[in-house]
A protein has these predicted regions:
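A conserved beta-strand-loop-helix scaffold within acyl/acetyltransferase catalytic domains
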Residues: 24-66, 76-84, 204, 209-312
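Catalytic cores of nucleotide-enabled group-transfer and carboxylate-activating enzymes in metabolic
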Residues: 14-17, 36-40, 44-48, 55-73, ...
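Alpha-helical subdomain
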Residues: 50, 78-81, 279, 360-363, ...
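Acyltransferase donor/substrate-recognition loop-hinge adjacent to the catalytic core
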Residues: 3-6, 151-230
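TRNA-binding/sensing appendages of the translation machinery
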Residues: 2-44, 112
Length: 380
């Protein structure tokens, strides 16, 4: 490491934003497990006017430089909805990538100073930029590429963040299992019981009614997750924005809604691991990769599928009915995933480490933890 000092400067220009996004390619250029994100999506995430998150939040981005070379980046953000749901004075930082400990210390100190100036008394991180984007630092599973919409980090970051005085706030866990040969007599009996119950209907979504289905699912999500740690509601604008991004990877057979007496009470969203389809694009969609990706998405056959979101109406939490609906949705989706999409591995998560209800579902026979992410906190 050079003895030259680290300087921190805010991201101001379009050129700065490009450098901020492109820096990840320098950090992970020799990491075979890293999957380059689509640059257009990262630019959209951090740009006011594109990401509706900025309608209720503000963020500052910085670059760390040494001798004219970029050696780190970070964001700090204040979200009005986080204030409402996680406590007044709660600020966050994220988008954290560095080449060395000196840059890490300087960037974290800078982010903390900005948060204090905004009146924050507590920092959570890394969260990039909200709980619905990429929360947490990967602390287990570095050797395996992340699935769609999950982060990947250098093992050294854990020590750097803890050296800055941060302690664990919460761990987020993902599980994986071989979905080709999954069977369990107890679960099979529960599913059979549900199939005999005429009140229950498990249906696929209808993509031709995409906006209507998206609103239904996200309303269920806001109800099902509202008591969870870290929960912040999605606004109507964010629902539309998320729907637009997710639409190309939504397939009728992979998204299920459970109804009881005609009322939607649970859902499960499963997506192909788009990282398998984009890794060789190196983050670039244009001019030719866009067509290549569209072709791959016509009928994607990925080895891995991910369940990023699953929820059961709050009124059914801790009931036998909740488990029954969950396992019915899992089984019906599993069958189609294997038969129609050629999938062999399923990933559930992320799941809060203390969400016993979801953990009891995710800990299926043969399932194991494949990634663990940690959100840290510190009093300012």
């Amino acid at each position: 490491m050079s003895s030259a000092p680290v300087t921190i400067r805010p991201v101001v220009t379009k050129k700065d934003r490009k450098a901020f996004v492109d820096f990840a390619w320098e950090v992970y250029k020799n990491d075979p497990a890293w999957v380059p994100p689509l640059k257009d999506e990262v630019h959209g995430l951090i740009t006011p006017g594109k990401n509706p998150w900025f309608e209720h939040a503000k963020a500052q981005l910085w670059l760390a430089e040494r001798g004219g070379k970029i050696v780190g980046r970070i964001s700090a953000q204040v979200d009005e909805l986080v204030q409402d749901h996680m406590g007044q004075g709660t600020g966050q930082w994220g988008m954290f990538e560095v080449l060395d400990a000196q840059a890490a210390e300087a960037l974290i100190v800078t982010a903390e100073q900005w948060l204090r100036q905004q009146g924050m008394t507590r920092a959570l991180g890394p969260i990039s930029l909200s709980i619905w984007d990429e929360p947490g630092l990967e602390i287990e599973g570095f050797e395996q590429p992340p699935t769609a919409m999950m982060g990947h980090h250098r093992p050294e970051y854990e020590g750097m963040i803890e050296a800055a005085g941060y302690e664990k706030a919460k761990d987020l866990i993902t599980y994986e299992l071989d979905i080709r040969h999954w069977e369990d007599p107890k679960i099979d009996r529960l599913i059979a019981m549900g199939e005999r119950n005429e009140q229950i209907r498990i249906r696929m979504v209808d993509k031709s009614k995409f906006n209507e289905e998206a609103r239904l699912i996200l309303n269920l999500l806001n109800d099902a997750w509202s008591n969870n740690w870290g929960y912040v509601p999605l606004t109507e604008a964010e629902i539309k924005y998320a729907g637009k991004k997710l639409r190309p990877i939504i397939f009728n057979e992979l998204v299920r809604v459970a109804e009881v007496d005609g009322e939607p009470v649970a859902f499960m969203l499963t997506i192909p691991d788009i990282n398998e389809l984009t890794k060789d694009l190196n983050g670039e969609l244009f001019p030719f990769n866009f067509i290549k990706l569209l072709w791959r998405l016509r009928k994607p056959r990925t080895r891995r599928l991910r369940v990023p979101l699953m929820g059961v109406a709050k009124k059914l939490h801790h009931t036998r009915m909740a488990s029954m609906l969950a396992f019915m949705m899992i089984e019906y989706t599993r069958r189609d995933a294997v038969a129609k999409y050629g999938a062999s591995v399923g990933e559930f998560g992320w799941i809060l480490e203390d969400n016993k209800g979801m953990l009891s579902i995710a800990e299926l026979p043969g399932a194991h933890v494949n990634h663990r992410y940690r959100v840290y906190e510190k009093a300012l």
